Amino acid sequence: MSLISADNIVKIYQSHSLVGASARKTVLHDISISIGQGETVALLGRSGCGKSTLARLLVGLERPTSGEVRFRGVPLTKLDRSGMKAFRREVQLIFQDSPGAVNARSSVRAIIGEPLRHLTSLDETRREERIQELLRLVELPPEIADRLPAQVSGGQLQRICIARALAVNPKLIILDEAVSNLDIHLQASALALLTKLQQEGGIAYLFVTHDLRLVQKFAARCLVMDEGQIVEEIKTADLDSMRHPASRLLREAVLPPLPVRAVETN
């Protein structure tokens, strides 16, 4: 059974003008995907093709117009309160815009501790122990817990967001362009960390990106998305054999390779 799946997902947005006219825009067309335990799947596509919309649907931030998102075979719409709490624990999302994903007035301790407060029954002492454990896991010093987001670097803040996502031991993390804003060395370091965590804990990833170079380093299977549709599915080892025009355009836009040493040693 898949950990999470989307079955025939359609998403339509309707907008209204000041004079009362309305317009409908279909951004996802009959999307079906599945992700298994411990699997890394890339969702590859240019900006604006619907990747982030699909990511929001998969974590329950939006509802599809038609079709179903299923968690361990059960539609999200059929989950009771305890089932939805389990879903929130097991499926986490890391956004591209890490500064926008955190409260600028909250300390790093409060940011990482947020899911622990809402999704676990840990007391304050155990929460603090878990926060310090997570900081060590993402290779950040303990004193950073007292800082505000503006007092840490971009790479550190992204690691803080990773620590927050890991706080409740998820089974799946959706990375929505989560390393795209980092420089090439920080990208390599972040991917090495995520790979290490997967090897140690069996976490599954949906890696949402427009960068084929990152897919080659991180994913085993690749879904190519264009204009709201999955147009190609291929193993990462076979990326040179991509056939769809949208896939070929992405292949031709590959950036310089990640630094090998950073990937191997971080």
Curated annotation (Swiss-Prot):
Pfam families: ABC_tran. It is a peripheral membrane protein. InterPro entries: AAA+_ATPase, ABC_transp_ATP-bind, ABC_transporter-like_ATP-bd, ABC_transporter-like_CS, Nickel_NikE, P-loop_NTPase. It catalyses: Ni(2+)(out) + ATP + H2O = Ni(2+)(in) + ADP + phosphate + H(+). Keywords: ATP-binding, Cell inner membrane, Cell membrane, Ion transport, Membrane, Nickel, Nickel transport, Nucleotide-binding, Translocase, Transport. Signal peptide: none annotated. It is an enzyme of class 7 (translocase). ATP binds at residues 45-52. GO terms for molecular function: ABC-type nickel transporter activity; ATP binding; ATP hydrolysis activity; nickel cation binding. Residues 4-252 form the ABC transporter domain. Part of the ABC transporter complex NikABCDE involved in nickel import. Responsible for energy coupling to the transport system. This is Nickel import ATP-binding protein NikE. It comes from Brucella suis biovar 1 (strain 1330).
